[in-house]
């Protein structure tokens, strides 16, 4: 399996298929905000590919160099409870060129149009 950035179309697919299913609407950023943040270079929506299939996601909000917030960790519903989430975290660790800080919090998302 390989952790890499998706195409924009793949991002839209996993947002609708995985993130909307796994997270309450109040905890889910609007897709347009994720796309805008990614285009501006301070958000990385990594996906774990098993061949051509995306089986999980780790979306990172980049901050000070060497630091990132794990914004979403999600595994496709058909692949849950099989170690995919742990594999995603391990592959992030293996990237080695950044230190990651994981912060879990609940918040109300404000649209940043």
Set out the residue ranges of the language-model regions:
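Conserved beta-strand in the GNAT
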Residues: 47, 52-62, 67-74
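Feature marks short, surface-exposed loop/turn motifs that line or immediately flank catalytic pockets
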Residues: 64, 77, 107-110
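Conserved GNAT acetyl-CoA-binding A-motif
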Residues: 95-113
């Amino acid at each position: 399996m390989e952790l890499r950035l998706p195409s924009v179309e793949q991002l839209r697919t996993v947002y609708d298929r995985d993130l909307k299913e796994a997270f309450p609407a109040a905890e889910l950023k609007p897709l347009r905000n994720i796309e805008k943040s990614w285009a501006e270079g301070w958000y990385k929506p990594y996906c774990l590919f098993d061949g051509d299939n995306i089986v999980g996601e780790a979306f990172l909000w980049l901050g000070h160099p060497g630091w990132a917030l794990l914004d979403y960790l999600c595994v496709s519903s058909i692949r849950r409870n099989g170690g995919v989430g742990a594999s995603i975290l391990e592959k992030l660790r293996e990237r080695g060129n950044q230190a990651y800080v994981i912060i879990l919090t609940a918040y109300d998302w404000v649209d940043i149009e």
